[in-house]
Design a protein with these regions (language model features):
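Acidic, Mg2+-coordinating catalytic modules of nucleic-acid enzymes
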Residues: 1-172
Length: 172
């Protein structure tokens, strides 16, 4: 189901998904669809999650960020700069051409590359590094704030007091 259909479902007065106790988390490029009151939030960034991390991985490559490339997991599994250049970067740079030639949706091609079983462990490390990157702190805090807001709404829907959960956790 696409973001547009999800938004329509969540905003539909007849379906009244708010009464179903659900939240929706969309890609960052769907930011205009964000509606906290309808429990719709967006992932950080103003792009699809795939494009965000394709771009970030290219930045890590082009700037030769040593503390990323020297990660023991990456080194132990052969995810070197050369491997990235010869495999993932080539795939990323061919997305527009592939979409044009195959008449496929660019978004689907992005997802296929991002979720490729050979690339996914690499992208997990890219995501981890992005989360820890101080440059992303502001956008992450905004997402976390939105996530907490919709989570509180969901807890309230189910009759669970958020403050009670915090107190119980602190007592453990």
């Amino acid at each position: 189901m696409g973001a547009e259909q999800i938004c329509n479902l969540f905003k539909d007065k007849i379906m009244n998904v708010e009464k179903l106790g659900s939240i929706a988390i969309l890609d960052g490029d769907k930011f205009s669809d964000k509606e906290i009151n309808s429990r719709i939030i967006c992932l950080p960034g103003k792009k699809s999650i795939e494009e965000l991390f394709f771009e970030y991985s290219k930045d890590l490559f082009e700037n030769d960020i040593k503390n990323f490339w020297q990660d023991s997991f990456l080194e132990d599994n052969g995810y070197t700069r050369v491997w990235y250049r010869d495999n993932i970067l080539v795939s990323i740079e061919q997305i527009d051409e592939t979409a044009k030639k195959s008449n496929k949706d660019k978004r689907k091609i992005n997802k296929k590359i991002f979720n490729n079983e050979n690339y996914f462990p690499f992208f997990n490390k890219v995501i981890d590094f992005w989360i820890k990157d101080e440059k992303n702190e502001k956008v992450l805090k905004s997402f976390i704030k939105d996530f907490i807001t919709v989570t509180k709404q969901l807890l309230q829907f189910y009759g669970i007091l958020y403050n009670k959960l915090i107190i119980e956790k602190e007592e453990q």
